[in-house]
Structures are given as structure tokens and as C-alpha cells.
Amino acid sequence: MRFVSIYILTLLVICCAANSNAQAIKKGISKKPASSVKPAVNKKPALAIAPIKIAGTRIKITTDSGVIVVLLYDKTPLHRDNFTKLVNNHFYDSLLFHRVIAGFMIQGGDPESKNAASDQHLGKGDVGYTIPAEFDSTLFHKKGALAAARTNNAQKASSGCQFYIVQGKKYTEEALSAIEQQRGLYFSPAKRKSYALVGGTPLLDMNYTVFGEVEVGLEVIDRIAQAQKNNFDRPIADIRMKLETLN
């Protein structure tokens, strides 16, 4: 009996030890493997990169065909300041785009167009002064270029008020090379790419002062250029403008 008691006691000790070890092991084991626990990630929204705004004076041109916004170049200060002055004095309000030629340009700024009869030939009105030419080889007649109209004069001085915006067309490398020879010009690789892919009127480069460019509203130029017109290239339905400075 003593042997049995010792045997039972021994079994009890072994069982208790085993149970104690099992509980210790159970406490040390996590319900999920450590490798499955993912660290918390603080997801922040990607920062939007704002477009860089080029410094300069901007003019809003509201027309019957839509809105155009042009940037005036600081490289042509005489034209920039004169144009801004006329805009701020409301000179252009209610004037017409009196001459439009698809694949070339749209022209306006004739003061005689404000109250012109429907059959009146326009384009000779002015403000009584001209502006000295401000040519810069980096400013060219790409599509959307804003340039000053002028009469035929040796100094190539600009009209004090009439302007045009280029619609133009696309040119091949061969055509650009021919213009270079004809006009004695040089078209840089960047200009060639612009004239080939975007279009413009390269024949006018260094002949008429370019003093700005369209930032918004190229499609408006296309619409105006396609307007029905009479034999003087004047739109049959009046296309009026209102100009204001934006900055």
C-alpha cells in the first residue's frame, strides 16, 4: 500500500508539474504569430503640386465667342504699358474683331469699329501715335501669340491700338527652311518644334512686334477665325470685345 501511495503521489507531482508547464507555455504564446502583426501606417494624402504661375500682366478678353486670357511680356515694356493703359481706360470695350482669316490671325482694336455700319470697311482707325518696334528673337508668332498691327513703315513701328492674335497653321521642316532662306531668319529647334506641332505664322517673325501670348482660350481664337465674313474679311455677325486687367 505504501508503494501504491508513493506511486500515486509521484503521479500527482508529475501531473501538477506538467500542468504548470503547459500553462506557462500557453501564457507565452500569442494568439497570432508575430510576423502577422502589421505596424500601423499613417497614410497621408499626396501633396498636390500647384502649377507655377509666370509673373506678368494678364488681360482678360471677353468676346461673343468666349473668353481669352493673355499674358503680356515684360520683354516688350512699351507695348505692355501702352496696351495696359488702353485697357484700363476702357478703350477697347465694344470694339470689334474686324478682320479674321482662318489659318492666319484675328485682328481688332480699330476705334472706328465701335459704331461702324455693317458694310463699313474697317482697319484704318488709330489713336494718333505709334510705338517703336520691340523685336526679340525669343518672342515669335506661335499659335496664340499677341502682336501689334502696323502700317507699312521703314521702322516697323506698331499701331498705337490695333492688335492681332495668331491662329496660324502647322509647318513642315522643309517649309520652315524655305522661310529661313527667304527672310534671312533662323528658327531654333524649339521654334521649329512649336511651328510643326502647334502652328503659327513664322513669316511674320521679326517683322511685327509680339508682346504677349494666350494662356486661356485658344479654342475661342479658332471659333472667331472660322466666322463667316464679307469680302473685307470682316465677320458678318459682329464679334465684340471687352478687356480688363486681371493683375
Give the location of each predicted region.
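Cyclophilin-like peptidyl-prolyl cis-trans isomerases
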Residues: 20-247
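Bacterial Sec-dependent N-terminal signal peptides
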Residues: 1-25
